């Protein structure tokens, strides 16, 4: 946290704290969310201003209950943050919007510096790990982001039972859709109700993945046990 703060970076989660999905790796509350707060974009923008941030990461819960998946508030939040904070750089870590390209396009048109969407795990493990998500649909999200000319970013966790070959294949899949920023971190079990850790991956293996990522053409690769999606986010702009 101190490292992020010293870099003038912080992460905000919008659209509430209750998710409509129940991924087996995530500690976010699940259930029926409260109505969306239409004043949230202004509140986030003011918070960024008061904290004198240089770079902000915005993420959200999944809002499959909303007709637009929360896309309008997503886009307005980006616009408001830029309006009140000239010179700020913004990364958005978005859900898949159920595969709705129009909803994703609203976020794209708000023009953040980076749009991130995490695969979270390899293709084989996706049904076990990610509630309602689809590996190929996530790749299509990233393809649409990259095709717009914005920087596309994704990340996975390891230690869930994947193989080295599957991790390398995932990198290849991401490069095929022109994703050029990639993060890898160790999965840690949030509670006994979540998926158990299958393996604590050795730091040497993380370094091997980092080198492989650059060899495959990623412009930025963060690969260490404690790396999370927003780690060193300000350096990816």
Give the ranges of each region predicted by the language model.
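Auxiliary Fe-S-binding modules of radical SAM enzymes
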Residues: 1-8, 42, 46, 52, ...
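Small/polar loops that bind or transfer phosphate-bearing groups
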Residues: 14-15, 92, 223
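Glycine/Thr-rich phosphate-binding loops of Rossmann-like dinucleotide-binding domains
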Residues: 22, 66, 125, 192, ...
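Core AdoMet radical
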Residues: 11, 27-43, 50-101, 107-141, ...
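N-terminal [4Fe-4S]-dependent radical SAM core
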Residues: 1-35, 55, 229-237
